């Protein structure tokens, strides 16, 4: 499957290019194999927007490939197969089981 993108709200700004830094709000779903269960959000108390460099492998493959086509202001849900998320190891600290499909709701805040 890779990554599937569903636009929730279109953006109106530029799209990031490989090597640029994007700042996003993100909420991840798929705790304990249940895509309705949140495991993490930058909107939770004590959290802040997350920044990463596109195409450098600093984040899961689903983010690198899914966010590159998004515009500033866009909100989209990315469904990532396990090989585009945390794979066979999962992410036990967040309750992500091995080989889990995950959903991420991402809002692009800025591109630099």
UniProtKB/Swiss-Prot annotation:
EC number(s) recorded for this UniProt protein: 5.2.1.8
GO cellular component: cytosol; plastid
Disulfide cysteine pairs (residue numbers): 26-80
Catalytic activity: [protein]-peptidylproline (omega=180) = [protein]-peptidylproline (omega=0)
Domain PPIase FKBP-type intervals: 19-112
Compartments, as annotated in UniProt: Cytoplasm
Keyword annotations from UniProtKB, A to Z: Cytoplasm, Disulfide bond, Isomerase, Rotamase
Example GO molecular function: peptidyl-prolyl cis-trans isomerase activity
A Pfam family this chain is assigned to: FKBP_C
Sequence segments annotated as region (Disordered): 1-26
EC class: isomerase
Keyword Isomerase set for record: yes
Keyword Disulfide bond: yes
Quaternary context: Interacts with FIP37 and with the immunosuppressive drug FK506. Its interaction with FIP37 is inhibited by FK506. Interacts with TOR in a rapamycin-dependent manner.
Protein family according to the UniProt entry: Belongs to the FKBP-type PPIase family.
Function according to Swiss-Prot or TrEMBL: PPIases accelerate the folding of proteins. It catalyzes the cis-trans isomerization of proline imidic peptide bonds in oligopeptides. Mediates rapamycin inactivation of TOR protein kinase activity.
This protein's name: Peptidyl-prolyl cis-trans isomerase FKBP12
